[in-house]
Curated annotation (Swiss-Prot):
GO terms for cellular component: membrane. It is an enzyme of class 3 (hydrolase). Gene3D superfamilies: lpxc deacetylase, domain 1 (3.30.230.20), lpxc deacetylase, domain 2 (3.30.1700.10). It comes from Marinobacter nauticus (strain ATCC 700491 / DSM 11845 / VT8). It catalyses: a UDP-3-O-[(3R)-3-hydroxyacyl]-N-acetyl-alpha-D-glucosamine + H2O = a UDP-3-O-[(3R)-3-hydroxyacyl]-alpha-D-glucosamine + acetate. Catalyzes the hydrolysis of UDP-3-O-myristoyl-N-acetylglucosamine to form UDP-3-O-myristoylglucosamine and acetate, the committed step in lipid A biosynthesis. Keywords: Hydrolase, Lipid A biosynthesis, Lipid biosynthesis, Lipid metabolism, Metal-binding, Zinc. InterPro entries: Ribosomal_Su5_D2-typ_SF, UDP-acyl_GlcNac_deAcase, UDP-acyl_GlcNac_deAcase_C, UDP-acyl_N-AcGlcN_deAcase_N. Pfam families: LpxC (PF03331). One of its GO terms (molecular function) is metal ion binding. Zn(2+) binds at H78, H237, D241. This is UDP-3-O-acyl-N-acetylglucosamine deacetylase. Its cofactor is Zn(2+).
Amino acid sequence: MIRQRTLKNTIRATGVGLHSGEKVYLTLKPAPVDTGIIFRRTDLDPMVEIRACAENVGETMLSTTLVKDGVRVATVEHLLSAMAGLGIDNCFVELSAAEVPIMDGSAGPFVFLLQSAGISEQEAAKRFIRIKREVTVEEGDKKATFLPFEGFKVSFGIDFDHPVFKGRAQTATVDFSSTSFVKEVSRARTFGFMRDIEKLRAMNLALGGSVDNAIVVDDYKILNEDGLRYDDEFVKHKVLDAIGDLYLLGNSLIGEFRGIKSGHDLNNKLLRKLRAEEDAWEVVTFDDEATAPISYMKPVLAAG
């Protein structure tokens, strides 16, 4: 059967918060079957636990932020994207601050950490959410949709009227039966416009942001010396963000997500709408890996 997964070992890392600019200590720990992904604010006494689920999303202005009883954990989407890509069901994420460290602005460092910790298959079937019919949310020219699909596919379209985006792909479709999340998506970095960053800093936000952890664009060009990691890195990062946001369903998806100019807010509204429409989805498990529409890297290979 396809089994639930957790980490073999505890692993630690240090980084800075994108918005706070503060140093953050991150610890990823194995968790029992059916735990889910649980964030822990270990800097608080008593420690506060916040489950990674759509209902706990409290803010979506610049990142996806989980909130419980006034306690926040911001910028969870890149770490959750890595968890989704590697099929990690159960994990404790301990943080010394109110924000997940930004690392290099992609999910790549989190993939490396998870693979370094090792992946352990557990004695319980992995539960998937299978989309049974279309569910859509729209706001103006933004749209987010779930569709039935035997596998997992993410399509995204962005539309920036800016010299850097001219002639670059602003759409991407990734079918994960034939495309590696680790190779093709996980390394895409977040991006920001210099003019926006200046405004954010005036509001005490993006204080940790730099060319070390984002693609920074001025009015004409990319400021990062090494350029882009993928030709379509901008839209690929939106795919990465969406995968992280969708993992707040609490299970891996069997279905297709299509986003047009969608962001964290609309993604979350789509999750809540899906949850409310119980005839639009079902929970499934697979006794036989060979017949399943989704497969994951073998835990041994995941360390490669």
